[in-house]
């Protein structure tokens, strides 16, 4: 599961992301915790567990949601009208962001080449998400 890093998670919170996430960070960013009710897909206990499955005190809203890359890309598309196109070329993965705020979403008004070339799709997606958060919304 590819969750966003702590810095991106903080920026997403500041920009209004509020999707249901399977994991959260402590405010210090020191530990990623998983929500058992979401992670297992069934109501087990309404409590958070660390990576070693030891119960942690539930501290509620002070935790910072850690969405997956897929969740963030969907949020950018559906809520912000920004489509992220990640493609592979001979040198690695690159990204272009399209603005799609049209009723039919079949055309775009603007596009931005993100200055990133990475070895993996995930690295490129995270760099692109960070670019969008810092420059476009």
What are these regions (language model features)?
Residues 1, 108, 129-137:
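Short intrinsically disordered terminal tails
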Residues 1-2, 117-120:
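Structural motif
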Residues 1-34:
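Extreme N-terminal leader/activation tails
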Residues 5, 69, 122-125:
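Short amphipathic alpha-helical segments that mediate assembly, nucleic-acid/protein binding
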Residues 18, 37-118, 134:
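N-terminal segment of the canonical double-stranded RNA-binding domain
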Residues 120-132:
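A short, charged, amphipathic alpha-helix used as a generic interaction element across diverse proteins
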């Amino acid at each position: 599961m590819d969750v966003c890093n702590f810095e991106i998670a903080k920026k997403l919170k500041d920009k209004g992301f509020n999707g249901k996430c399977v994991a959260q960070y402590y405010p210090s960013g020191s530990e990623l915790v998983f929500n058992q009710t979401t992670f297992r897909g069934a109501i087990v206990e309404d409590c958070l567990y660390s990576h070693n499955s030891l119960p942690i005190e539930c501290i509620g809203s002070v935790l910072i949601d850690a969405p997956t890359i897929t969740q963030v890309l969907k949020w950018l598309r559906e809520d912000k009208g920004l489509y992220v196109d990640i493609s592979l070329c001979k040198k690695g993965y690159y990204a272009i962001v399209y603005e799609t705020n049209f009723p039919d979403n079949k055309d775009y008004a603007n596009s931005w080449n993100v200055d990133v070339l990475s070895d993996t799709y995930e690295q490129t997606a995270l760099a692109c998400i960070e670019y969008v958060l810092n420059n476009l919304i």
